[in-house]
């Protein structure tokens, strides 16, 4: 978000989270007359937390009408919580909410670069006027249509993700690591601050085992690693490696 904001000579304003979750009150306090767009990743990356539909409604109600609220639901398909919504109701209720989604996550088409948006016609008209011609290739469109038809794959990916996320969380917390609740296809793992067992040392150890995770220093979480949920063999290898590291 900061990169695309600066591309149009705008000023990005980061809003602090509360307990690793977006804070509606902090968002509203940060809004000024100059605010044009509010971007919210829901579920959030890299924490895996989310705002409920009621909190989203409270956020939209507290924003000035001139502020466009953009809900990035890249990980929405992984969420099974009853109080979650990607924002369809908010788009339907007004003319200043945009919902964006991607085929890069649960559909496994990250390299295809295909996404979509549900938004007011006026917003779609602006996007159509500024987008590049032929911005979505025929191959990407074909891949997207095939992915939408393969509902069995999506259902299995969702079930496997829930099972292995819970299993991985249980194993890692058993090693004394902190793993905040996640509704996405990854977990945020927080490590001790001592040099021998901190996140940097854990990352290096995992790399020596051929396991790649994501360092979180750039997100303001230098004590953490983000670990994607894969298949059982991959998660077993990860757990075994971290068991060795923590011992």
Task: Spell out what each predicted region is.
Residues 37-41, 70, 116-118:
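Structural motif
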Residues 13-19:
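Short beta->alpha connector loops at strand-helix junctions that form conserved
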Residues 162, 166, 173-209, 225, ...:
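Conserved PLP-binding catalytic core of the aspartate aminotransferase-like
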Residues 1-10:
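Substrate-binding/gating loop at the entrance of the active-site cleft, primarily
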Residues 96-180:
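PLP-dependent aminotransferase class I/II
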